Amino acid sequence: EQYTKPFDIECIDDDKLDSTLLINLPDLHIGYNTADEYSKYQNGILTTLENQYENVVICLLGDLFHADNFQSKTIHETRVNDTHIPNSWEEAILFVEPIIQKALATSPNVKLVYTRGNHDETISWAFSKYLEVKYPQCEHDVSIDQLKCVTIDKNAIFLTHGHVKKKNFVQLCATLYPQEW
């Protein structure tokens, strides 16, 4: 059985749960790179999660995958290295799911945020939707908005892949998210 059934978490020590961990996962380019090549990065994240946090926010910040389609092209039709999409999908699972599972085992509040990249916005969105179905106990933001905002305590953190240049990025944040700003 491939799907993870929803489960309740039991935190080890509620006294430790007083902070938020923001996990940024930008430009992994799975398909060009493998989960194994990122094992030190993944292990560092898993070790950090052992500290337990009140909130964990996992940000898929674009270009999780190297290509967006079976023709090994990006969203702008740029041909990249040969990429096998089914293998890339499995590699992404090997990298991302242990992080989600560890976060769920050690934190009462886990959120996943998808942002569009310039290589893979469609397949990464589909992967985010897959994670939304597989892990319903997490909060998910899978909207296709280019700019996202995560509020932690009284702090607003703005998230984007960064490939779309905006002259007035600060003004854009304030306009799109006036309450948070």
Annotate the PLM regions.
Residues E1-W181:
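Extended recognition/assembly regions associated with phosphoester-bond processing machinery
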